[in-house]
């Protein structure tokens, strides 16, 4: 990649020193200073420039000044979503490797333009998909991939809140706000990673506008994958009682992950043949079909808790630039993700099932 000097630290800077931009700068400086030198930042708001100075970072006077600095090899773009394309292309043309915050952009044509410039300049360009390292996701991933439940036919992934959309650019559609592009882009990326190369056959989506009539404050999408797996992603911001973070059904049992802290359990059937059900009262009637299983026919297990370190993302960035290894987050993955987002918006507008791959 461009500006390779094997064995040296990578000079890094951040454009957009808000919540995520400051997070990148602080975390990398604290945890990976052996590989990266966080030189400075630029933000159009002076109070953020001052905040960067107070953390010991150089606050560049302009974007051009930052991009023209030969010490900087890697630029993190953490601006509002609608500004990503212009800044990413500018950085690439200045000979910088680029990490762009998610969503990389809002349309497939814009993404293709960015990739084209990366190819033209020979610079490395990728996207920050940090929630591939969320502990709860890693637990769900291990449950599915280990075949613990047998063939998995249903996965439900939920994130619920009760505060609506944040009161900054994230509630403005023209700036790329809304929950599909905010939280949704994370959970949809997790879904595509979890499903691997299985084709996404169709989807049905509903968008909500409870707290903001112009910008989606929530959505629900059901995706049907090759092999018979139904995968639901639900992001809602007006829920005062949260449903579980993950609910996974397989032929041999069910897994429940209650929250980010990975509280939950796995229950597996131990004896399918034991016909031990007796009628129970259900409302004003009785049922054997819905009678709970006895302890003789099921067994409870703790959730797996694989280790997860988000800084592996930056370790990979270093190895891509210095050693030429493949990136974890690829262009093709982002192409598929943005096409999925476009399909969700299309379905949310016309209410029709969308057939995909």
Where are these regions (language model features)?
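C-terminal helix-rich "cap/oligomerization" subdomain common to oxidoreductases
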Residues: 1-9, 74-77, 304, 312-357
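Beta-loop-alpha module in the N-terminal Rossmann-like domain of NAD(P)-dependent dehydrogenases
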Residues: 24, 44, 57-117
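Predominantly a Rossmann-like dinucleotide-binding segment in NAD(P)-dependent oxidoreductases
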Residues: 131-212, 219, 351
